[in-house]
């Protein structure tokens, strides 16, 4: 495919840089003729594949993967009133089969509670069937009216991982909420994406949920990106869909449920947070290729360089490190540019001098360059890969936390969210919360366990130790 050789705009203009990079690095093609619907380039899809395989491996420890229908009959979708209130203006409808109008309109799943839970009713009979922990990775459809953007706000969400669990008691479901949060923490840590977990305010929780825990990360423009959510659903859906089980005493009880979702926003976060003016910077767990080997040949006789490259590639692959040799007939500099644009974590340069010293030149994507001996090469490279992932995460976390600031007044908060997040005391009343959102023109992300403090609610003046985070959001 034709590589776009255009240079990137500066990352200081994040939105322009982000859009240009998605095309130049061949992640997603935004030219599909439906708003909010985009096309994966094969390279972008290789990132998705790597990232979602990692997510599957984490889930498959104690979940089972399955697949539910995309089409949902209107009566099923409308059953849970709070849920449908939250989604009715986002649902796409299928009204015809060929030339004939359908008797019952069918919704394209915006999320799959209303497709799955009628089946859970049929599948769950006794406490022995619990806990039931299933997930699927599917496309979902939401008629988003806010600004659509590839990987961030799509109308066809192409990589929607949704897990749906059922438990005997509210506490068991609460335990599952925490297990899901631990799994998400591990997943985002492996992607070197820092996050703060906020409990969403009552008025912004998932429609039909008891409460919502959200994983929020900060994009370079200071806006928050909700990259994952975990919802405690209590018995609301169980009562609506009559999902009951027979307990040990033979009595019928409603199940308690949770659901938790991650979409391709996790990839938007990796690209946005770690990328630089030369292109993508991919943590090893997000990149199909971890090391590209570049032969440095000056004259006809390559002095054994080609052979050495082959040996290094085989050595690394034998140790589960994905290495490729770029032996195209191109100047090394042109190769560096190409692989840096694609965000490959490491480059190994091998020239006659390296052969003589029995070493290779290891260049880390962020520029760190060092000569390492051939002896123990795979072990050294593996350690360097892990070091890179840790350095990326620490740098991103430090930069995010440096931009979260405790503010005394709403004016100060308004100023602060121009380029970061503000935290302020909040009495917990919805009226005050909504007034804070209006005054600062932002979203209240909610309260975070990790953010402590005390003060007076800026609206009603009541003393409180509840601290809330405010941010501009995607
Ligand atoms: N239009 C969208 N484009 C891309 N990602 C989205 C979009 N809408 C939501 N998401 C992502 O999908 C995650 C789950 O969506 S959700 O509405 O919060 N939760 C659910 O749908 C629940 N059924 C859990 S799967 C969100 O946390 C967000 O990261």
Swiss-Prot record:
Q: Which UniProt keywords apply?
A: Aminoacyl-tRNA synthetase, ATP-binding, Cytoplasm, Ligase, Nucleotide-binding, Protein biosynthesis
State the similarity comment: Belongs to the class-II aminoacyl-tRNA synthetase family. ProS type 3 subfamily.
What's the domain remark here?
A: Consists of three domains: the N-terminal catalytic domain, the anticodon-binding domain and the C-terminal extension.
User: What does the function comment of this entry state?
Assistant: Catalyzes the attachment of proline to tRNA(Pro) in a two-step reaction: proline is first activated by ATP to form Pro-AMP and then transferred to the acceptor end of tRNA(Pro).
Subunit structure of this entry? Answer: Homodimer.
State where the protein is found.
Cytoplasm
The organism's taxonomy opens as: Archaea, Methanobacteriati, Methanobacteriota, Stenosarchaea group, Methanomicrobia
Which organism is the protein's source? Methanocella arvoryzae (strain DSM 22066 / NBRC 105507 / MRE50)
Source superkingdom: Archaea
Task: Report the EC code(s) recorded for this entry.
Answer: 6.1.1.15
One of the record's GO cellular component terms = cytoplasm
Protein name as catalogued: Proline--tRNA ligase
Looking up Gene3D superfamilies in the UniProt record yields: Anticodon-binding domain, Bira Bifunctional Protein, Domain 2, C-terminal domain of ProRS
Q: List where the protein spans the membrane.
A: none
One GO MF annotation is: proline-tRNA ligase activity
Q: Does the keyword ATP-binding apply?
A: yes
Q: Which SMART domains match?
A: ProRS-C_1 (SM00946)
Output one GO BP term.
Answer: prolyl-tRNA aminoacylation
PANTHER family (UniProt xref):
BIFUNCTIONAL GLUTAMATE_PROLINE--TRNA LIGASE (PTHR43382:SF2), PROLYL-TRNA SYNTHETASE (PTHR43382)
Main localization is cytoplasm
Q: Which HAMAP family does the UniProt record give?
A: Pro_tRNA_synth_type3 (MF_01571)
Name the chemical reaction catalysed here. tRNA(Pro) + L-proline + ATP = L-prolyl-tRNA(Pro) + AMP + diphosphate
- NCBIfam families in UniProt: proS_fam_I
């Amino acid at each position: 495919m034709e590589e776009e050789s255009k240079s990137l705009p500066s990352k200081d203009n994040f939105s322009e840089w982000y859009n240009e990079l998605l095309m130049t690095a061949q992640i997603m093609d935004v030219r599909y003729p439906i708003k909010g619907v985009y096309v994966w380039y094969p390279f972008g899809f290789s990132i998705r594949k790597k990232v979602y395989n990692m997510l599957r491996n984490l889930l498959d420890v104690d979940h089972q993967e399955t697949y539910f229908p995309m089409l949902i009959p209107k009566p099923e979708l409308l059953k849970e009133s709070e849920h449908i209130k939250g989604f009715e203006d986002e649902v796409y409808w299928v009204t015809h089969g060929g030339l004939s109008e359908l008797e019952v309109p069918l919704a394209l799943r915006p999320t799959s509670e209303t497709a799955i839970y009628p089946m859970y009713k049929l599948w769950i009979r006794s406490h022995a069937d619990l806990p039931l922990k299933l997930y699927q990775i599917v496309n979902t459809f939401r008629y988003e009216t806010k600004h659509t953007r590839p990987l961030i706000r799509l109308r066809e969400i192409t990589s929607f991982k949704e897990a749906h669990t059922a438990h005997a008691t509210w506490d068991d479901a609460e335990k599952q909420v925490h297990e899901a949060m631990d799994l998400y923490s591990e997943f985002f840590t492996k992607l070197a994406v820092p996050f703060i977990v906020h409990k969403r305010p009552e008025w912004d929780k998932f429609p039909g949920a008891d409460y919502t825990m959200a994983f929020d990360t900060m994009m370079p423009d200071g806006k928050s990106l909700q990259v994952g959510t975990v919802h405690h659903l209590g018995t609301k859906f169980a009562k609506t869909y009559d999902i009951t089980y027979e307990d040990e005493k033979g009595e019928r009880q409603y199940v308690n449920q949770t659901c938790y979702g991650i979409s391709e926003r996790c990839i938007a976060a990796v690209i946005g947070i770690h990328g630089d003016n030369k292109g993508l910077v991919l943590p090893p767990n997000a990149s199909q290729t971890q090391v590209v080997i570049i032969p440095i040949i000056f004259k006809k006789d390559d002095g054994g360089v080609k052979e050495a490259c082959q040996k290094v590639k085989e050595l690394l692959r034998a140790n589960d490190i994905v290495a490729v040799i770029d032996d195209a007939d191109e100047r090394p500099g042109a190769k560096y540019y190409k692989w840096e644009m694609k965000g490959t974590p490491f480059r190994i340069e091998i020239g006659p001098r390296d052969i003589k010293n029995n070493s290779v030149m290891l260049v880390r994507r962020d520029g760190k360059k060092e000569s390492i001996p051939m002896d123990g090469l795979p072990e050294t490279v593996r350690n360097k890969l892990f070091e890179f992932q840790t350095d990326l995460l620490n740098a991103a976390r430090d930069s995010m936390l440096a931009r979260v600031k405790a503010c005394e007044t709403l004016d100060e908060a308004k100023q602060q969210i121009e380029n970061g997040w503000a935290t302020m005391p909040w009495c917990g009343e919805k009226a005050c919360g909504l007034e804070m959102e209006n005054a600062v023109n932002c979203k209240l992300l909610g309260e975070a366990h990790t953010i402590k403090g005390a003060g007076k609610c800026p609206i009603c003046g009541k003393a409180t130790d509840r601290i809330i985070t405010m941010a501009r959001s995607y």
